[in-house]
């Protein structure tokens, strides 16, 4: 929160970049989505979560091209340090279970946090996380209802266009039948698995996107820090 991060300012830091979702009124920026709105007046900012960094870029494309009415997201996420290696105590009883032995359903604020960088989507997205026994790389499964009728090839074409233009280096599209380990050390925020894109009844769209929740996210932290440095006054 602002009080906790503010201790760094009190100790002499000029800026604080939180590498996690911020609380309260802390401004949130996602590179490729709204980072161009960064103001030098912001002393404490958040780079959101790795999952929001994966989700927001391709959600932005979907909303701009087809208009998102509502949707849900599931991230199948490698287990993290906030879980227990052995069954033990935790405020979340599911995270209390042995992380390397279980699929652990738990909460995530990633979908709702998209509204912090794309305000027009406030109240339209929600989701959960499934923590799984893999060391790295995660995958988002998004299902949305859209206002414009479409089909899978058109959806993938929109992603390809964005990946080659305004979201180059942020979004990628993969046509190969790959698995999670193939996306280790991927520099982009999200990679669309084109063969898994589905459209039901011409207005319900399902998109699968891979992301390296460690390395890929770290790249965006560096990018945002660079934006802060380049706007120094």
Swiss-Prot record:
<dbReference type="GO" id="GO:0019253">
    <property type="term" value="P:reductive pentose-phosphate cycle"/>
</dbReference>
<feature type="binding site">
    <location>
        <begin position="108"/>
        <end position="109"/>
    </location>
    <ligand>
        <name>D-glyceraldehyde 3-phosphate</name>
    </ligand>
</feature>
<feature type="site" description="Activates thiol group during catalysis">
    <location>
        <position position="77"/>
    </location>
</feature>
<dbReference type="Pfam" id="PF02800">
    <property type="entry name" value="Gp_dh_C"/>
</dbReference>
<protein>
    <recommendedName>
        <fullName>Glyceraldehyde-3-phosphate dehydrogenase A, chloroplastic</fullName>
        <ecNumber>1.2.1.13</ecNumber>
    </recommendedName>
</protein>
<dbReference type="GO" id="GO:0009507">
    <property type="term" value="C:chloroplast"/>
</dbReference>
<keyword id="KW-0560">Oxidoreductase</keyword>
<dbReference type="InterPro" id="IPR020829">
    <property type="entry name" value="GlycerAld_3-P_DH_cat"/>
</dbReference>
<dbReference type="InterPro" id="IPR036291">
    <property type="entry name" value="NAD(P)-bd_dom_sf"/>
</dbReference>
<comment type="pathway">
    <text>Carbohydrate biosynthesis; Calvin cycle.</text>
</comment>
<feature type="binding site">
    <location>
        <position position="213"/>
    </location>
    <ligand>
        <name>NADP(+)</name>
    </ligand>
</feature>
<keyword id="KW-0934">Plastid</keyword>
<dbReference type="GO" id="GO:0047100">
    <property type="term" value="F:glyceraldehyde-3-phosphate dehydrogenase (NADP+) (phosphorylating) activity"/>
</dbReference>
<dbReference type="InterPro" id="IPR020830">
    <property type="entry name" value="GlycerAld_3-P_DH_AS"/>
</dbReference>
<dbReference type="InterPro" id="IPR020831">
    <property type="entry name" value="GlycerAld/Erythrose_P_DH"/>
</dbReference>
<keyword id="KW-0113">Calvin cycle</keyword>
<keyword id="KW-0150">Chloroplast</keyword>
<feature type="binding site">
    <location>
        <position position="95"/>
    </location>
    <ligand>
        <name>D-glyceraldehyde 3-phosphate</name>
    </ligand>
</feature>
<feature type="binding site">
    <location>
        <position position="80"/>
    </location>
    <ligand>
        <name>D-glyceraldehyde 3-phosphate</name>
    </ligand>
</feature>
<feature type="active site" description="Nucleophile">
    <location>
        <position position="50"/>
    </location>
</feature>
<comment type="subunit">
    <text>Tetramer of either four A chains (GAPDH 2) or two A and two B chains (GAPDH 1).</text>
</comment>
<comment type="similarity">
    <text>Belongs to the glyceraldehyde-3-phosphate dehydrogenase family.</text>
</comment>
<dbReference type="InterPro" id="IPR020828">
    <property type="entry name" value="GlycerAld_3-P_DH_NAD(P)-bd"/>
</dbReference>
<feature type="binding site">
    <location>
        <begin position="49"/>
        <end position="51"/>
    </location>
    <ligand>
        <name>D-glyceraldehyde 3-phosphate</name>
    </ligand>
</feature>
<feature type="binding site">
    <location>
        <position position="131"/>
    </location>
    <ligand>
        <name>D-glyceraldehyde 3-phosphate</name>
    </ligand>
</feature>
<keyword id="KW-0521">NADP</keyword>
<dbReference type="GO" id="GO:0051287">
    <property type="term" value="F:NAD binding"/>
</dbReference>
